[in-house]
């Protein structure tokens, strides 16, 4: 899995798999699109207004927690 983020547009994309086939984009809401293959496999999720969608804190940081290891990492989302 890979997460990309473009702070200029506040857009993130969560890659669940690399695209190996043509996908169909389904608009789930005004702020979320999901890319799905013909067999129903989800390839990725596009998040518009990513700071809010990803639950960034008031300083624009996304905190990723590895529950198994009890470790966390911070990613700066805001400019």
Segment roles from a protein language model:
Residues 1-79:
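Small, basic N-terminal interaction modules of short regulatory proteins
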């Amino acid at each position: 899995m890979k997460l990309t983020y473009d702070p200029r547009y506040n857009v993130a994309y969560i890659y669940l798999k690399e695209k190996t086939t043509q996908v169909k984009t389904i608009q789930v809401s005004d702020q979320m699109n999901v890319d799905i293959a013909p067999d129903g496999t989800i390839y990725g999720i596009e998040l518009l207004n990513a700071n809010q969608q990803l639950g960034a804190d008031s300083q624009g940081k996304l905190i990723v927690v590895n529950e198994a290891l009890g470790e966390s990492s911070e990613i700066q989302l805001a400019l």
